[in-house]
Each structure stands twice: as structure tokens, then as C-alpha cells.
Regions:
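C-terminal lobe and adjacent flexible extensions of AdoMet/dcAdoMet transferase-like proteins
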Residues: 173-174, 181-248
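Conserved Class I S-adenosyl-L-methionine
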Residues: 135-155
Length: 248
């Protein structure tokens, strides 16, 4: 069971169907929650049209069970979720509030986990700007306090060195959009929202750890160090190039 909060036009189910053909043969249930019934309805129409068009490529596919839920975060759903996703939603809720982000992140962590079962996983993605980066860092801290394991992007479970405090560095990632469909670029241009780069901050945490996290070998002469690159190339003295990175 999946739960997509702030689903809009079924953004996550559509993205998963397109990007992960191996999931098309699995009988999955998606609870898609949003305050706009029109967006949910429109998204389901898009999803069904895509399903019809991909049949030749994956004839073994089965139609996923899409359950539309109109409401805000906190609205009850019938089943506990194995996987909770939330993309580009929280910033709409905390952006203009006077409450401290520390308090907000704790409250939303409790709300998120109230939807999940004992083995749930959570993926939250926000725009790659300082305030959102700070929120993601605080959300990460709250998830750790709830005994969740951070699977990505962090290679460690200690304090974030780029915690997004005012005037400081914040953890975010930037991708080029040159491989996006030409029609999408054209649509963005016509809306005067042209983008050649997409920037985002995210955290992926889970209660299911043993099967997905490789445990370090104790007393190893060559201990493995995980490194996560977190910046574009930067110029260094003597015509060298480097990148910022986090390590375990």
C-alpha cells in the first residue's frame, strides 16, 4: 500500500509507472490524497491513458488500484501504508508561517508516521532552496529520533554538516533538464517558467533496515567509507577541480 500526500494530478504514481516498468505487473494500491478533487480526477485520466499506451511494451501489466482521497494532511485513510511519499507539498504549508520550523517539522513527522505501519518507509522531496533544505534537515532529525534509518541521501546518521541555518550551506541536489521531453520544455517556455536545471532537497527513511542496508565489517583493515557528492564541480587552486561531499 502506497500513500502519496499532496498527490495533485497523481504525480508519484505516474512517475513510478513510467520510470519502473518492473512494478507494472505488481498489484499495488495507491491512496492519493490532495485538497483538489479536480487535480486528482485529471491525474487519474492521465494515468489511465498512459497505462493503455504502455500495454504493448509490458503486456503482463496490471492496473494499479488508485484510491482518490480529498483532504488535507491528517485526513484518515483506511489502511496503514508501507510506503509514504510527499513531493513539493510541505513548502506550501510552512512557507509563510510564523511558527519555528523546528516545531513544524516535529508535528509533520508525527503526522507522516501516523499513516505508516511498523515497516513503513518515507520519502519527502522539497524544492532545493535554503528554507526547504532547512526543513528537510529538521525532518531528518525528527525521523532519526523516531528510530527511523536514513537511507538516502545521507551516508551517516549523525548531525547534518549542511543544516541550512540562516546564511549557511544547505543540502540540495541539482540536475540538468536537457533530457526532459521537448514538449515539456515548450510548455514551460510558454508559461514563462523555463528551467535548464532542477534543484531539490530530499530525505528517504525506513523502518525496514536489515534487507537494504549493508552492515559494516568490524575490525576490517580496509573499512568501507560511503561518500555522497553534494555539489557541482568547484574550481580549486592550480587548475584543479573538486566537489563537496558527505562521508560515513
Amino acid at each position: 500500500v502506497f500513500l502519496d500526500l499532496g498527490s495533485g494530478p497523481l504525480t508519484v504514481p505516474i512517475a513510478l509507472w513510467l520510470a519502473c516498468p518492473s512494478l507494472r505487473s505488481k498489484k499495488l494500491t495507491f491512496y492519493c490524497l490532495d485538497t483538489s478533487q479536480n487535480a486528482l480526477s485529471f491525474g487519474e485520466e492521465i494515468f489511465l491513458s498512459i497505462v493503455a499506451k504502455t500495454y504493448k511494451a509490458t503486456p503482463e501489466q496490471v492496473e494499479w488500484n488508485i484510491i482518490r482521497v480529498k483532504g488535507e494532511i491528517g485526513t484518515e485513510i483506511r489502511k496503514k501504508a508501507d510506503f509514504i511519499t510527499c513531493g513539493n507539498m510541505f513548502n506550501e504549508l510552512y512557507w509563510n508561517t510564523s511558527k519555528p520550523l523546528e516545531e513544524i517539522s516535529k508535528n509533520y513527522t508525527n503526522l507522516l508516521l501516523s499513516y505508516g505501519n511498523e515497516k513503513t518507509s518515507v520519502l519527502v522531496i522539497e524544492p532545493g532552496v535554503p528554507r526547504s533544505g532547512r526543513f528537510i534537515t529538521l525532518l531528518r532529525n525528527s525521523l532519526i529520533r523516531k528510530k527511523m534509518t536514513i537511507l538516502s541521501p545521507c551516508p551517516h546518521m549523525v548531525d547534518c554538516p549542511m543544516e541550512g541555518k540562516k546564511g549557511g550551506k544547505w543540502c540540495h541536489f541539482t540536475l540538468l533538464t536537457d533530457k526532459a521531453p521537448k514538449k515539456l520544455h515548450k510548455l514551460s517556455d510558454s508559461a514563462k517558467l523555463s528551467k535548464d536545471r532542477a534543484s531539490f532537497s530530499f530525505v528517504f527513511a525506513s523502518n525496514v533496515v536489515d534487507s537494504v542496508v549493508e552492515k559494516p565489517v568490524e575490525n576490517s583493515k580496509n573499512p568501507q567509507i560511503d561518500i555522497r557528492v553534494v555539489s557541482d564541480p568547484i574550481r580549486l587552486p592550480r587548475e584543479k577541480t573538486g566537489r563537496y561531499a558527505c562521508s560515513s
